[in-house]
Amino acid sequence: MLGSGGCRKRNAEVAEESAPVVTLAAELATNGLGDLPGAIYQSQAASPIHWQPWTPETLARAKEANRLVFGVIAIPQQPGFQGVLAALAQNPALVSTINDHYVPVLIDGDASREVGLLTGDLCSEIKRGLQLPLFVWMTYKGDPVAWIPVPKSSGGKVADLFKQSHSMVSQMRADDAENHKTYVMDNSAADNAARRDRISRRKNSKVMSTQPAEDMVRSLRQLNSFYDPSSRTFDEAGGLFPAGAIDLLATAAMQPGLPEEIRSRSLETTRELMIDLLPSAMFDPLDGGVFSARRGNSWTLPSFNRDCVSQVRAAVALLHVHRASGDALVLDKALGLIAYAEKAFTTSEGLFAAGLASESEVAAWLWSVEEIEKALSPEDAAWWIKAAGMKGLGNLPSEVDPRREFFRSNSLALGKTLATYAAEEGQSLESFSLRFEASRKKLLEVRNARLGKVARDDCSHAGATFRMVSAYAAAFGVTGDPKFRDKAVALLDKARAAFAEGPKLRMFSKDAPKSVGAGRAFLYGLAMQAALDVATISPDEKWLVWAEDLATTAAELFTSAEFLKESPDDARILDLPITDLVMLFDDSTAGLISFAEVRLAERERPLVPTFSQLATPLPIYAVERPILHTDLLQATLAREFKVTIVAGEGISPELKLATERLLLRMFQRRAANSKEEVPAGSVKVIFSNGQSRSVTTPEALQEAVLPLPKKS
């Protein structure tokens, strides 16, 4: 014992002699989020945890302090992070541990997108499904040491998860100090080098399709086969609202050149999905909007979260479904989603916020029959109970609530238009609408009282704003209402002023460090999409010029020898070749850039060749897993089965409007050049097989490009 003690004493003396000089920067003694833009950062600016921004300077301070970084990666649209961070902040012992032992760093994985994408790889390495927020311990070099996804749970469970990892990491650090080793640094660096090599091999081993048109058809067959009308299930779609799949299927139903049976099958699958979704509780009948995901395997019980991007993606998909099906209810739902996004996510700057996911209890959103009867008059209560399919024992299927947590509870859903309900009640639309609005407001007031005050996100977000521009443009195309065109143009003007810094983009309307707020490749893809959408419906040439300028800048920032970089070099901290190929949280960068390429190329403004070569191929893995790559497949559909609208001189205002109202992204438009023989007053429609057709009236144009398939 004495010998051991003497040895420990001598080791301690040596360690003390060789211990590095530790400098604790003043910035680490306080919460450093301050006025950092973004909903996540603003929500934690007053936290007792000394959160620091994700910057090179923060990592340099971690090195000086001889501390590991304790990072939390979250995105504002994913629920759970606020409760997890609150559980940490409300535990004084945990706060002290975090502040005294680590450099705590909060990372918005939506804005710093490459970090958000990395969470998928990290979760896969420990054989866990992707779940945010993610706790990650890192060295000052940005090498992950340990990590764990944190499910939404009680404060005690969050504390236990932190303590377990903290204990392990602390013991490794203590062993290093006692034995004069650098195992933690060396091992994490070696692991990250292996990770770098693995990611590189994965991206370099991609097999590209040599027959993209045929493989496009094969992927559509497979996507359609995932839907089973008997069981009403959509295999591999998961629990998210399937906006991407719906959008692809609806556009495939309208795309000339595809085999008739594929178009017919796609239309039928789309209609069946609408039967499942439109009358479901995924659409909130009280406040509007669509919930982004469901709980379990039924659309009767949503995960009650709404963000701006999910509203807009669903709205655009439904607008395309309405084009294909002519269903009035689909259009009603789509325009309702746009109206809800305007109400819920418009910021004080007149732009749009991403939206903070709410973290309320499920029970607060559900109703018993008695609660409806208490809140409304007997007549109105009877109507709501019948229309929403409410039951005394509840309307949730047993497979959704196997433990009967929500016994006698009902979700609310309305599956018809107000005009249909008015006719069923034998009332005029005007009188029924007044009655409906009065009862809706009463129920909403009761629900809001249960939910309590919900924080509103007022941080203008470039991605959400560009998405809204595209939604307005799509709504104009479907309805022909000029107010939507005016909104699209006005919002894009505002967005360019707020989010463009010279030729580059930023995520927030306020200054932020590049690693926090510089535009990633994904944002450039969204901006190009919005600019091209507006260029299609507006006579102003500046939007096409801006889209081309954005493409040039993106090529300079994100082109590497072999892959499409997600982060510009001056914003990158992680030394990993991260690229965005899969629809992990949203559309993928690969899909957005591919779509921009085909649209610009058909307007005779091609991308830089090295950039174009990264954007145009169709990987075989996208064909084999279509549900995860619907955006890239849609771009391929537009490329391989392209339809080009070439306008001659002097076309009538009516024909010009008809060309503007065609499918924004699937049919490419341009003015005839001097070498093309397009008669004055006419439009030439050029198909992918080389055939063409000249038309002079809106009706002839419609017949040329949008003859719907027959039902199989």
Language model segments and positions:
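C-terminal motif of bacterial Sec signal peptides marking the signal peptidase cleavage site
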Residues: 3-6
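Glycan-recognition and catalytic cores of secretory/periplasmic carbohydrate-active enzymes
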Residues: 9-10, 20, 32, 36-37, ...
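N-terminal low-complexity, Ser/Thr/acidic repeat segments characteristic of secreted
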Residues: 14-15
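N-terminal leader/targeting and pre-domain segments
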Residues: 18-65
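Thiol-based oxidoreductase modules, predominantly thioredoxin-like and allied folds used
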Residues: 46-56, 72-77, 87-119, 671
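Loop/turn elements at helix/coil->beta-strand transitions in domains of secreted/extracellular proteins
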Residues: 65-69, 100-103, 132-133, 140
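Anionic-ligand anchoring segments at beta-strand to alpha-helix junctions in alpha/beta enzyme folds, i.e.
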Residues: 80-82
